[in-house]
Curated annotation (Swiss-Prot):
It holds the Pfam family PX. It comes from Debaryomyces hansenii (strain ATCC 36239 / CBS 767 / BCRC 21394 / JCM 1990 / NBRC 0083 / IGC 2968). PANTHER family: FI18122P1, SORTING NEXIN. This is Endosomal/vacuolar adapter protein YPT35. GO terms for cellular component: endosome membrane; vacuolar membrane.
Amino acid sequence: MTASNRRGSTHRNSVTQLNKVLPVPIQLEDETSSGHFNSTSHITDVLVGDYHVIQGEGGSSYVVWSIRIIVDDSVYSSMVIYKRYSDIQRFREALLEHYPNTEIPPLPPKDNFSFQRLSMSDYWLENRRKGLQWFMTNVMLNPKHQHSPVITHFILN
């Protein structure tokens, strides 16, 4: 038997042996009824990133913030959501209602300046981003809130 015949024979035996291996059964789980992440999963990091100026109807503009949420310390288990400051305000109000005896950190103050003036101020927007980062970190990484329906609603809507 030549070397090439032996290699071909070995390869055929490997394929034949693989055909004898039974497939591992697939287990499907319905996660829709729980309304939130798997109970063993948890948010391990939250990063408030860049802001984006969106042109609204009638020429008005507003800012949305990108928020990356990392689950179980895996970059592959992360999502990016985009939220306006007013969305985050409503999120905080929902947390206060759902957890009346828990101290929820404040948001950075809402400024009364015009949007045109704010859009010129990178310094002001960076301070707002830092304040939002502090708020999101303190809320989303708090073990009391990890599986809160309020957080799930904020992330998924």
